[in-house]
Regions:
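A glycine-/small-residue-rich N-terminal strand-loop-strand element
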Residues: 69-93
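Mid-domain Rossmann-like dinucleotide-binding core that forms the NAD(H)/NADP(H) cofactor-binding site
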Residues: 124-193
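Rossmann-fold dehydrogenase core element
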Residues: 229-275
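Short, well-ordered loop/turn sites that connect or cap secondary structure elements
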Residues: 82-83, 140, 226
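NAD(P)H dinucleotide-binding glycine-rich loop of Rossmann-like/cofactor-binding domains
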Residues: 57, 74, 89-150
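C-terminal hydrophobic helical "lid"/dimerization subdomain
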Residues: 34, 260-305
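Glycine-rich cofactor phosphate-binding loops and adjacent beta1-alpha1 units
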Residues: 171, 183-249
């Protein structure tokens, strides 16, 4: 029987188990995918801990995972455009991709370009959708200056590149270990910590937009820098929407097969990098989350069944 990650109750990393499950069967309009790689995301840890129960409650036993890349193993009735053996990138809304096999809606899949490595493809969907939506939300145009917090993380590392492609000057807030990577991608790196507002002001004469992928006080920082609330997007501080009138457009706002295909095409063309911080086998899912939750990583942590 195939294996999948499950948890029976809310809790820490130790509630995650890899167990045998029945082989999933695709229904009408669905595709069975043999998973080759699946990214893990901070929001999945928060769901497992019960911190997002009011927004996204778990039903036990619960699976995990949204991102996936793999090989089509079968299709349900009515599916066109995909057949057994096709290499695909996709996403599932059913928290089920941290597994050897997953059933996915056909409309949630895009063809994986041949030159894109499995671990990169499997890391792309949630971070890519979120970054895409955030850049779109702040309406960047050539000549704008945007600051991105968490600029070397899974979402931030993609957002800074998409912002550069939009013609913006990009200031990236990150730990000093990641400043070289940011500078190499045309981003002005700025260190966290006391005095960050002054360092940002010295880096650029104005800030027109702000993308917060980190949380904490960064929405307030954006407003302190004079950014209009309509051009601030946070993917973390959801309460700031009501409090300050900022935006909170992320994964759901960007999720589509067409966006996935566009981003995968940029990767294949060498115009977008998805940094991979670490790769773990499915059986080491607990270790994968420990690496994620230590923080200060560049890019994504990925499981390979």
């Amino acid at each position: 029987m195939p294996q999948a990650v499950r948890f029976e109750e809310y809790g820490g990393i130790d509630v995650l188990q890899v167990v045998e499950v029945p082989q999933p069967v695709p229904g009408p309009g669905q595709v069975l995918v043999r998973v080759k790689a699946a990214g893990i995301n901070p929001g999945e840890a928060k769901i497992r801990e019960g911190l997002l129960h009011a927004r996204w409650p778990a039903v036990f036993p619960s699976g995990e995972g949204t991102d996936l890349a793999g090989i089509v193993a079968g299709t349900g009735s009515g599916v066109t455009g995909f057949s057994a053996g096709d290499e695909v990138i996709g996403y599932t809304d059913n928290r089920a991709s941290h597994a050897e096999y997953v059933v996915v809606e056909a409309g949630h899949l895009a063809t994986k370009p041949a030159g894109v490595p499995w671990e990169v493809a499997g890391a792309l969907p949630v971070a890519g959708f979120t970054a895409y939506a955030a850049v779109r939300a702040v309406a960047l145009a050539p000549g704008d200056t945007v600051t991105v917090s968490g600029a070397a993380g899974g979402v931030g590392s993609i957002a800074v590149q998409l912002a550069r492609r939009a013609g913006a000057t990009v200031i990236g807030l990150a730990g000093e270990a990641n400043h070289g990577w940011l500078a190499g991608h045309g981003v002005i790196p700025v260190a966290y910590g006391d005095g960050v507002a002054g360092r940002i002001r010295r880096a650029a004469d104005r800030v027109d937009a702000f993308i917060d992928t980190f949380g904490g006080d960064y929405v307030q920082l954006a407003l302190e820098l004079g950014v209009k609330p309509a051009r601030v997007d946070t993917i973390v501080s959801f309460d700031a929407v009501q409090r300050y009138g900022v935006k909170a457009e992320g994964n759901a706002a960007g999720a589509s097969a067409s966006v996935l295909a566009e981003l995968a095409g940029l990767i294949a063309a060498g115009q977008l990098e998805v940094p991979i911080a670490a790769v773990f086998p499915l059986a080491k899912v607990q270790d994968a989350y420990r690496r994620l939750e230590r923080g200060h990583i560049r890019g994504k942590v990925v499981l390979v069944p």
